[in-house]
Amino acid sequence: KLCDVHSALFHGLTKEEKIANAEKAVEESLKKEETSEMTTMTDAYVRKHELAKALRETKGHPLYSFTEANEKFRKEIADIRGALEKGGDVSKKISDFRQIAIHYAQKGDLIYPLLKVRYEISGPSDVMWTVDDEIRDELAAIDKECNHDEEWMKRVQAVLTRADEMIYKETNILFPICAMNFTAEEWYGIYEDAKDYASVYGIENR
């Protein structure tokens, strides 16, 4: 079962071993569930999402850290929207929310190129990368704007919607694709390289 991933973590003495053990446990569990050489598209879809879910719940795995950051972003989006509805000042919250650019930089440096170059999966890099940049740039422009009129608030709501949609796409499209393709060695490389980035809302890249 994919839940065996969690027990596998306790066999490694280091985070590196934990990641490797988790990947091995997932791979073995999927092999056990194979009933034939050919699987239907539905089976592949389910397997892909089960694998991504297992890795997202594996402490120490890069997908766990990415998901933890996304949960924080989603909470901040809700807080900003709530403050706007009450007519509150969201300037500080907008400035803080720009930390999402760090998350986007990690994807742009560590995930998109690997998918496109090594696996020739260009969709995420061709589409999501552009949207990431647009969200980042719009947040920067909004943060610098002094006139917080109705038009400004509409722009805030619009960019929050796009950021929220990106979280959904990462969870349901990007992460499952990565989970089905990246090797344990590649995940370990992402884990190591992520240490070079600043933390997001205090969430360490561990």
Report residues per predicted region.
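Small-residue-biased structural context
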Residues: 1-101, 105-206
